[in-house]
């Protein structure tokens, strides 16, 4: 049975042929592309639906290329994909996420997802966090719908090898707040990561993430509506993200400490409170 993906952030020049070629360049074959247009003006609404042979193919494509550079796009853009479930209510089942650290630059979303889903079927997605230039920050998230599998993965995959060239570092990521907003019309499956807290021994380190710089859900009543009607979009930039356990350069820290200490010593020596010659010396009057 055919299945579709939603694709957003399109430029007006991106027609059906452009989208099909972009997927083909990434090694993916699509059955059809439907560009959504305003039914009154005929102007593209900025998004489309891409049809695949079956759900498995669509899901594989989503995890493989979502967030990667879009071939031929000017200015440069990235694939922005999401699941589509026409007329169905959103899946509000609980989600259990893990923070994955010490990722090497070669690890992408698809590799992160495949590493976990082959052992833990409830894994629903993986996201490697990128900086503004598209380079990995060295960490990401994986999401599960089964809490037991999340806990198993945390224990069984801690320090595991096979994902990139370094052992992975795992910790539980807890959603900061579950925000369920009422959306009119039919609703689509939300494939997103919200804000998380990362708990370690003595502190919380906070970061946020949205799928490809955004967490979105959208409704689709009929063709011809504008994009603002179809999609509610919430921006949370990647610049708010940071590794909760950065490496400490002890040598550099000691150097800075000594430099600051020398500055303090010099300042004290230059002030008017000079040491006395002897214990019995008279204390000079203040000027």
Swiss-Prot record:
Function (record text): Involved in the early steps of selenocysteine biosynthesis and tRNA(Sec) charging to the later steps resulting in the cotranslational incorporation of selenocysteine into selenoproteins. Stabilizes the SECISBP2, EEFSEC and tRNA(Sec) complex. May be involved in the methylation of tRNA(Sec). Enhances efficiency of selenoproteins synthesis.
One cellular-component annotation, GO: nucleus
Ranges where the RRM domain occurs: 3-86, 96-175
Source taxon at top rank: Eukaryota
Keyword entries, A-Z: Cytoplasm, Nucleus, Protein biosynthesis, Repeat, RNA-binding
Family that this chain belongs to: Belongs to the RRM TRSPAP family.
Subunit structure: Component of the tRNA(Sec) complex composed at least of EEFSEC, SECISBP2, SEPHS1, SEPSECS, TRNAU1AP and tRNA(Sec). Found in a complex with tRNA(Sec). Interacts with SEPSECS. Associates with mRNP and/or polysomes. Found in a complex with EEFSEC, SECISBP2, TRNAU1AP and tRNA(Sec).
Gene3D superfamilies from the UniProt entry: 3.30.70.330
GO biological process terms on file: selenocysteine incorporation
An annotated Gene Ontology molecular function: tRNA binding
Subcellular location field: Nucleus; Cytoplasm
Pfam families (UniProt xref): RRM_1, Trnau1ap
InterPro entries: Nucleotide-bd_a/b_plait_sf, RBD_domain_sf, RRM_dom, SECp43_RRM2, TSAP1, TSAP1_C
Iron as UniProt keyword: no
The protein's name in its UniProt record: tRNA selenocysteine 1-associated protein 1
């Amino acid at each position: 049975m055919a299945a579709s993906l939603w694709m957003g952030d399109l430029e007006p020049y991106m027609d059906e042929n452009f989208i099909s070629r972009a997927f083909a360049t990434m090694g993916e074959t699509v059955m059809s592309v439907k560009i959504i247009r305003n039914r009154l003006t005929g102007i593209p609404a900025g998004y489309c639906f891409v049809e695949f042979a079956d759900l498995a193919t669509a899901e594989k494509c989503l995890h493989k290329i979502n967030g990667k550079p879009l071939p031929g796009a000017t200015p440069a853009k990235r694939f922005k994909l999401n699941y589509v479930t026409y007329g169905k209510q959103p899946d509000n089942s609980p989600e259990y996420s893990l923070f994955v650290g010490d990722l090497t630059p070669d690890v992408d979303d698809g590799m992160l997802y495949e590493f976990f889903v082959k052992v833990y079927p409830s894994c629903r997605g993986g996201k490697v966090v990128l900086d503004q230039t598209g380079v990995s920050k060295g960490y990401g998230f994986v999401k599960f719908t089964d809490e037991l599998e999340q806990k198993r993965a945390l224990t069984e995959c801690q320090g595991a090898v096979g994902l990139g060239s370094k052992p992975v570092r795992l910790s539980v990521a807890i959603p900061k707040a579950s925000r369920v907003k009422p959306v009119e019309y039919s609703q689509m499956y939300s494939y997103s990561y919200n804000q998380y807290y990362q708990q370690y021994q003595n502190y919380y380190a906070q970061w946020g993430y949205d799928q490809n710089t955004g967490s979105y859900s959208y409704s689709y009543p009929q063709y011809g509506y504008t994009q603002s009607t179809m999609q509610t979009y919430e921006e949370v930039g990647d610049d708010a993200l940071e590794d909760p356990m950065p490496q400490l350069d002890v040598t550099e820290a000691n150097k800075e400490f000594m430099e600051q200490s020398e500055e303090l010593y010099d300042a004290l020596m230059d002030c008017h409170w000079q040491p006395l010659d002897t214990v019995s010396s008279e204390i000079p009057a203040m000027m």
